[in-house]
Amino acid sequence: MKKLVATAPRVAALVEYEDRAILANEVKIRVRFGAPKHGTEVVDFRAASPFIDEDFNGEWQMFTPRPADAPRGIEFGKFQLGNMVVGDIIECGSDVTDYAVGDSVCGYGPLSETVIINAVNNYKLRKMPQGSSWKNAVCYNPAQFAMSGVRDANVRVGDFVVVVGLGAIGQIAIQLAKRAGASVVIGVDPIAHRCDIARRHGADFCLNPIGTDVGKEIKTLTGKQGADVIIETSGYADALQSALRGLAYGGTISYVAFAKPFAEGFNLGREAHFNNAKIVFSRACSEPNPDYPRWSRKRIEETCWELLMNGYLNCEDLIDPVVTFANSPESYMQYVDQHPEQSIKMGVTF
């Protein structure tokens, strides 16, 4: 059997493996479909993650250096690529009561022919309803961060909303904002194909940031007022600068991206200073949730799964391209790393 592994920075390969015996609380899944994570995972793949030499210390709530003799946060050769899998249970441990052999499930896991997952008190291992879409299922993770971004920005009926970056998170945020009652939804992305999809699913306008004063265009489209909410998913300094320029007085930027380091030139002394801008950093998996105890990571996940499975959210167009597992190393390097403009969220079939 084979699994997709990062053997070196920016190098993916299929590597042979043998499954261990499952524990009493586990199930083994034969994977049929899967998808990688195009945001934080590719940062790891490029060896650009702070987690390589540092760890986020929960006690101090800050990054601290890893001890010199401790394992690195990412070890190439062992680093398995992939985020979500859909497949069929082929083996159950003796303590597993909520699942049975033959069940079709979705869960967190790497791109490999089989995945072993805890199946006792694990709500994250989801049963696939009859006839449900695997493409919607593998968007379970990005949907959570999109929902968190929309909720943390307090999008309300009638708001002018802008979503910057139309990858999977941004595309889902477009749908959620429109369905939440936003009167004008604007997408921002330089890739025409992504903009076409956003328009099909709720965007009233799309802007190409290349050669465009995005902030001024947002003001123009909203009668000079600006956006009540801007959801920033791209992580680029220019995008945040434009968002501050296009934000309405007292508006909110929901910063969802795991940002790249900003180069010299980013300026908080212009529109941000005069327009009482608010920036909220949004991360679905940071606990406690801003709306705790009413909302938690679990409630976000439960809600997203329901919306994905009942068709409220439509992610069929987002899984593009779809490649075979046999071709996944080359496809990962091309579509996820080297040419991300050629994809939104890559799907994998086994």
UniProtKB/Swiss-Prot annotation:
Gene Ontology molecular function: metal ion binding; oxidoreductase activity
CDD domains, alphabetized: 2-desacetyl-2-hydroxyethyl_bacteriochlorophyllide_like
Top-level taxonomic group: Bacteria
Major enzyme class: oxidoreductase
One Pfam family here: ADH_zinc_N
InterPro entries (UniProt xref): ADH-like_C, GroES-like_sf, NAD(P)-bd_dom_sf
Catalyzed reactions: a D-guloside + NAD(+) = a 3-dehydro-D-guloside + NADH + H(+)
Cofactor: Zn(2+)
Note on how the cofactor is bound: Binds 1 Zn(2+) ions per subunit.
Gene3D superfamilies for this protein: Medium-chain alcohol dehydrogenases, catalytic domain (3.90.180.10), NAD(P)-binding Rossmann-like Domain (3.40.50.720)
SUPFAM superfamilies on file: GroES-like, NAD(P)-binding Rossmann-fold domains
EC number: 1.1.1.-
Keywords annotated in UniProt: Carbohydrate metabolism, Metal-binding, NAD, Oxidoreductase, Zinc
Similarity field: Belongs to the zinc-containing alcohol dehydrogenase family.
Role of this protein: Catalyzes the NAD(+)-dependent oxidation of the hydroxyl group at C3 of D-gulosides leading to 3-dehydro-D-gulosides. Probably functions in a metabolic pathway that transforms D-gulosides to D-glucosides. Is also able to catalyze the reverse reactions, i.e. the NADH-dependent reduction of the oxo group at C3 of 3-dehydro-D-gulosides leading to D-gulosides. In vitro, can oxidize D-gulose and methyl beta-D-guloside, and reduce methyl alpha-3-dehydro-D-guloside and methyl beta-3-dehydro-D-guloside. However, the actual specific physiological substrates for this metabolic pathway are unknown.
Protein name (record): D-guloside 3-dehydrogenase
